[in-house]
């Protein structure tokens, strides 16, 4: 199963050393069973996106580990890929960028010709051949149709997908330089959120009870984190409800709305997927 990790400390810039590498169940450790690609998306001081990615696992891609340890941003988006569609290439590796936004996805969407038809000219922004990047292009199209309103456009796009296309899962994170959105749909995979206050509680013991991790960069900065699973033993991790859209604004205010209360019109089970796609969606 692909792993998603997003964090925002907006409007403050922070280092993400603790979360990307040192947690007991960190992305680097997870990637040992997700060998198709890793990527890290951040934002420069001028607000422009910076995405660094490799079609390799993090345990074989030491640069990812080094860069993750030293990156500074207001929002972060990291992804460890186990491919469901698309070859192991840089264009197919998450995260993706469009119109100053960064996006990553875990799940499977089928009937890509139908999706391409709906994208029309927005298909030109897709550089690879994954369902994920196509979904991002559809979201971009709907954001434009809603005058740049990300929440409205994202909601409109995923409602269209839920109604029109076969779906196994759509878990996603989308970030700008100072905002974050996350969606879990349907109940197929988990997606957790943690609101972290600044202070001494930023010292934790990992799930095995033997490794203690500290983050000096976050001791005086509150953060909101979204991840495919709890990344430490903090009891305040909460799973998003199926169909729930999480929005964290520029001041770390959180809005949670169930935008897809119904199951997909064309749900897929593991047995409906080809062998590669099915393997990509298993917990590892």
Predicted features and spans:
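Short acidic-glycine loop/turn motifs at beta-strand connectors
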Residues: 8-11, 43-48, 99, 175-179, ...
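Catalytic core of PPM/PP2C metal-dependent serine/threonine phosphatase domains
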Residues: 147-187
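Short acidic (Asp/Glu) patches
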Residues: 54-66, 78-100, 117-121
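Long, charge-dense
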Residues: 118-142
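Extreme N-terminus nucleophile/cap motif
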Residues: 1-57, 245, 253-268, 272-273, ...
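Structured interaction and signal-relay segments at domain junctions
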Residues: 37-74, 78, 184-188
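Conserved beta-strand-loop-short alpha-helix elements that form
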Residues: 2, 101-111
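A conserved acidic, glycine/proline-rich C-terminal tail/linker
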Residues: 200-245
């Amino acid at each position: 199963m692909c792993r998603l990790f997003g964090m925002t400390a907006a409007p403050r810039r922070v280092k993400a050393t603790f979360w990307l590498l040192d947690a007991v169940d960190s992305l680097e450790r997870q990637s040992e069973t997700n060998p198709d690609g890793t990527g890290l998306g951040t934002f420069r001081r001028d607000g422009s996106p910076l995405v660094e990615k490799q079609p390799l696992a993090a345990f074989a891609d030491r640069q990812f580990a080094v860069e993750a340890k030293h990156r500074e941003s207001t929002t972060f988006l990291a992804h460890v890929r186990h491919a469901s569609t698309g070859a192991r290439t840089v264009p197919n590796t998450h995260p993706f960028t469009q119109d100053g936004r960064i996006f990553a996805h875990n799940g499977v969407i089928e009937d890509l010709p139908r999706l391409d038809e709906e994208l029309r000219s927005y298909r030109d922004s897709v550089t690879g051949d994954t369902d994920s990047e196509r979904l991002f292009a559809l979201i971009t199209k709907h954001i434009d149709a809603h005058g740049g309103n990300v929440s409205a456009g994202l909601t409109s796009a995923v409602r269209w997908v839920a109604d029109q296309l076969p779906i196994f899962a759509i878990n996603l994170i989308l970030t700008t330089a100072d905002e974050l959105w996350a969606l879990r749909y349907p109940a197929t995979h988990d997606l957790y959120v943690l609101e972290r206050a600044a202070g001494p509680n930023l010292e934790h013991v990992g799930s095995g009870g033997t490794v203690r991790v500290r983050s000096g960069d976050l001791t005086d900065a509150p953060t909101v984190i979204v991840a495919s699973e709890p990344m430490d033993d903090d009891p305040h991790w909460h799973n998003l409800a199926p169909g729930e859209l999480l929005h964290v604004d520029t001041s770390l205010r959180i809005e949670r709305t169930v935008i897809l209360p119904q199951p997909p019109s064309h749900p897929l089970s593991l047995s409906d997927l080809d062998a590669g796609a099915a393997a990509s969606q298993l917990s590892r």
